[in-house]
Structure formats: structure tokens, C-alpha cells
Amino acid sequence: MPDYLQQYFTLDNIIQIGISLAILLVFLILRKLFTRYFFNLLFNLTNRPKTEIFKQVVLAFDKPARWFFVALGLFLAIRYSPFLDEQMPVISKIYRSLIVALLCWGLCNLTATSSFIFHKVNQRFELDMDDILAPFLSKLLRFVIIALSVSVIAQEFNYDVNGFVAGLGLGGLAFALAAKDTISNFFGGIIIITEKPFTIGDWVETSTVTGSVEDITFRSTRFRTAQGALVTVPNSTLSMEAITNWTRMTKRQITFSIHVSYATPIENLERSIHSLRTMLLEHEGVDNEIIMVNFDTFADSYYNLFFNFYTKTTVWAENLNIREDINYKIIEILGAEGVQFAYPGQMVVVKQKHESDQFQVNLNKEEKERA
């Protein structure tokens, strides 16, 4: 073996390398045992309802804890290595930064939208979180956690965070001008969340878009249209528009007209209107608060019957089924009363020619007698 290698691979160094590899191997093996037994033990201790939140904390830090165990084994293995003594200060900083990153990972998991934490906070403080507020708060908390983690890691490597913040203060005006649209979209999102004109899954209509709300972010809101297209609208634009939320209807209106022939006897028409009102009052799908069935107009060639009522359901498919059932019953009632539907048409009166000529002759005689 060359002399320059012999100074590295001495008996003591080989023993230290063996110890380092053994430490790393033990920690790799214990990582599986740690995951299998340690977390099972924690789960068994947290089966009671009062410790449900602790169980969620364990779930959030499951994977970060596994990697921490591996990182700890790697750090100890490097520490016993005979070749990296001079690099240990830098390695220690990297190790501490890795711990901060793993802690950040676990906290981000803990603040996920589906986390039990949001449910408990919502119950404890009665915040009335909906499907929009929870994702928004989740993203906001994650941003704060990541920003703090980056700041701690930067300070670990002696980076002057205060100077960076001061630099942002000096360039704040330029940043505000450059990010004017982003800031307006952010505050537009806050307005939407606080006023709650809609929530995830609602069908809304604005001057810009009509569709189902899929998600709201710091910058924009995404909609799924009836054609299946995904439309993204900036929050600043959405917060300044009139928003119609069709999902929040308590009942759905049905209004239409029926044309009845002038040949229909008036008695039959009166009985038909009375029967139609009774039918709507007794229909289980119709709201009884407002029911209007009226003969309201004399048209050119028909009587006009006006209908206005509301269905109890706001679901579009159920509303169509109720409308179809009512239409069939209208046909039955009008048919039973002998009422005929009017068709678009025009009456043309034709006079015979000889009658017109006789009228003209008589008119000429009268004019001569007067003369």
C-alpha cells in the first residue's frame, strides 16, 4: 500500500470506520423498529377521545421522525469518522438545519386542511370555518412556518436576516408598486373569505364566470363551468363583482304560461283554473307559500293562463322531475274539462266578389240621387 494511504488506513482509523458504519447500520435497522413499535405504543396510549389531538400530532410527525432517526445515525457515524474532524462545525450546522427542516415538515402536516387541529379549534372557539376558510388558513400557516424555518436556517449559517428585512424596508415602495396586483388579489381573497358569498362546491354566477367553486388561493379563485372548463378569476376582480349564489336558494321558482283556445267555454276555463290550483296545493314537491294560476291576458288568438310557483327542492334534476310531473297533470286536467290548447294562427276573412260589386252599385245610385 502506498505511504500516503497508510497514514489514513491505520488500525485505529479502520476501527473508527468500522464503528461509524456499525452505528449507521444500527440506526437504519432501528428506524424500522422505531416506526413499528414506538408509534404503535403511542397509538395504544392515545386511544381515548381526550388524547385524539395527540394522536394527530403523532401522525403529522410520523415521516419526519423516521428521517430524524436516520439523520441522527448519520451524524453520529460521521462524528466517529476519523477523516471529517475539520468539517464537523459545518456538518453540525447542516444537521441542525436538517432538524429545523424536519420540524417544519411536521408542522406543515399538522396544519393541513384535513388536520384534526382545525376541527378542534373550530369547535373550541366557534369560528364557523367553512370549506374556504380552512384551506386559506392552512396555506397562511404553512407560509408562516416555512418563512420562520428559512429564517432560522439562514441565521444558523450566519446570514444577517435583520439586514435582509431592512433591505426590504428600503425597497418597500418599489416592491409595493411591482406587486400591486398581487396585493390587491390577496386582500380580495380576504374579503371573499370574511364575507363568505360562497363556499367550495357552490354554483355561482358573476359577470365574469358561471360555475362551481373548486378552490380559492391567495391570488385567485378557480371555477368549474358547466362545459367542464376550469376558469381562474383573480380575487380582486371577483371581490368587485355582483355574485349570485344559486346553491343558497331556499326554493326554486317555476313560471310559465299556457295558451287556451278562444273556443273554450268560460265555465270550463274557470273549473280548469280551480283544479290546477288544487293540484299544485296538494303536490308534495311544491311549496304552498306562493301559488299563482290566473287567467291574465286576452291575446290575439288565445286566453293566456299564467303559472308561478316554487318547488321545495333546489336541486336541478329533482326540479325537472317535479316540473315534468306537473306538466302531465296539467294535460290531464285540461283534457278532462274539454279545454283545447291554442296554436299559433291567424284568422283571414274573405268576402265573395259579387257581394262587393252589389255594394258598389248601391253606393253609386245613392250618390246620383243626392246629386
Swiss-Prot record:
Disruption phenotype: Cells lacking this gene grow normally in minimal medium or in high-osmolarity environments, and exhibit the same survival capacity as the wild-type strain upon a drastic osmotic downshift. They sporulate and germinate normally. GO terms for biological process: transmembrane transport. GO terms for cellular component: plasma membrane. It is found in: Cell membrane. It is a multi-pass membrane protein. The chain crosses the membrane at residues 9-29, 58-78, 98-118, 133-153, 159-179, 183-203, 330-350. The keyword ATP-binding does not apply. Keywords: Cell membrane, Membrane, Transmembrane, Transmembrane helix. The keyword Ligase does not apply. PANTHER family: LOW CONDUCTANCE MECHANOSENSITIVE CHANNEL YNAI, OW CONDUCTANCE MECHANOSENSITIVE CHANNEL. May play a role in resistance to osmotic downshock. Belongs to the MscS (TC 1.A.23) family. This is Uncharacterized MscS family protein YhdY. The lineage of its organism: Bacteria, Bacillati, Bacillota, Bacilli, Bacillales.
